[in-house]
Design a protein with these regions (language model features):
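Domain-level signal for soluble alpha/beta catalytic cores
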Residues: 1-129, 143-364
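Intrinsically disordered, low-complexity proline-rich regions
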Residues: 129-132, 137-140
Length: 364
């Protein structure tokens, strides 16, 4: 199901360079060409850090996204964006993110923005051949030893969480909003596949956060209908976590409420948050690995303890007691956007080095 055992990957996001955050606060001083250069440089920086770490799978670090899912609302017509955070002071938390009003039927005539992001990543990641300046076609085969390029898209249920229901428009609750957003996300996935994307993560952290109080079978139905037209055409991953806005969780950090229902997700790789939970419920990777590749969150993005390669190797050996090497993938617990870049860089390097130690032990 993947290129080799004990694959190393990331969830999607990566810390913004300090200069990008400063520039984003002064975008009115930049022209269109300046902004293009700014984003290209930010993606190249995130990409270089991932390549230096030696990852098997890399992303653009979501350098165009203010937040994993918040930036997508700028592409959706029919909503009035919140003008300000509802709470400015005090400890950082999820309640500092407000919700957008739905004022018209929800549409996305320009897509959700992930295709241009993916094409930029492709352009920056693939080296020129024979010093040619000609662009590499999007459907070209991967170059030898080149990393897999992954895109990430929020699922419709997670996207619906930041919208206010509007019964007058036929959106009385979050479920109705989810159904309206589902075809928009599905079309975005189809467009990514058409652009040559060979791996995409359809992330529904809200499902894992609220599985304890909602019917998990309903979540399975939503997820599978979202990805049904790209199943078998690209590697579909999903990420189950408990929230990481400002490094804060929002749901009870237990996997049990999701299973066994989530085993019916029609994905090729399922990622579970483990490191921040001291690998509680690790035995659940056994049924996951029977169904698809089990991606393990093996470094804690909420902690500034830098896991050593030996730490990583010990954790991998624990995982091998529950799943075979050819079904295991290793990643951070969540996206790295809420982790300082200096720490993110070292954590990724140590993760890859730890994986390589175990590969050598296993002879794979």
């Amino acid at each position: 199901m993947k290129d080799h055992p004990l694959r190393t990957t990331v969830i999607g996001s990566y810390p913004f360079p300090g200069w990008l955050e400063f520039a984003c606060a002064h975008l009115d001083q930049f022209g269109e060409a300046d902004r293009t250069e700014l984003i290209d440089d930010a993606v190249a920086t995130a990409l270089r850090d991932q390549l230096d770490a030696g990852l098997d799978v890399v992303t653009d670090g979501e350098q165009t996204r203010l937040d994993f899912n918040l930036s997508f609302y700028g592409f959706i017509q029919g909503i009035e964006l919140e003008s300000a955070s509802p709470r400015h002071f005090g400890p950082p938390a999820h309640d500092q993110r407000g919700k957008h009003r739905v004022i018209a039927p929800l549409t996305a005539p320009r897509g959700l923005g992930t295709v241009p992001d993916y094409l930029r990543l492709q352009r920056l990641a693939l080296p020129p051949i024979s010093h040619s300046l000609l662009p590499i076609p999007s459907h070209s085969l991967p170059l030898p030893n080149s990393p897999t390029l992954k895109a990430s898209v929020p699922g419709p249920y997670t996207l619906a969480g930041r919208l206010l229901p509007n019964p007058d428009l036929g959106y009385p609750d979050r479920w109705a909003l989810t159904e309206a957003l589902l075809p928009l996300v599905r079309r975005e996935l189809e467009a990514l596949v058409a652009a040559g994307c060979r791996e995409v993560s359809v992330d529904e952290p809200s499902m894992s956060c609220y599985a304890y109080k909602e019917d998990p079978r309903r979540f399975v139905d939503i997820f599978n209908r979202t990805i049904e037209t790209v199943t078998g055409r690209t590697r579909v991953c999903t990420h189950l976590c408990f929230g990481n806005y400002k490094a804060r969780a929002v749901g009870p950090r237990q996997l049990a409420p999701m299973f066994p229902a989530f085993l019916d997700f029609k994905c090729d790789e399922m990622h579970v948050e483990m490191a921040s939970r001291e690998f509680a419920e690790l035995e659940l990777i056994t049924p996951i690995a029977r169904r698809c590749d089990a991606a393990i969150g093996i470094i804690d993005v909420k902690s500034y303890y830098l896991e050593t390669p030996d730490d990583i190797a010990r954790r991998i050996r624990r995982c091998l007691a529950f799943a075979p090497a050819d079904r295991l993938v290793f990643a951070p617990d969540c996206g790295l956007s809420q982790t300082a870049r200096w720490a993110a860089k070292q954590k990724l390097k140590n993760m890859v080095e730890g994986v390589r130690k175990v590969r050598k032990e296993l002879g794979v």
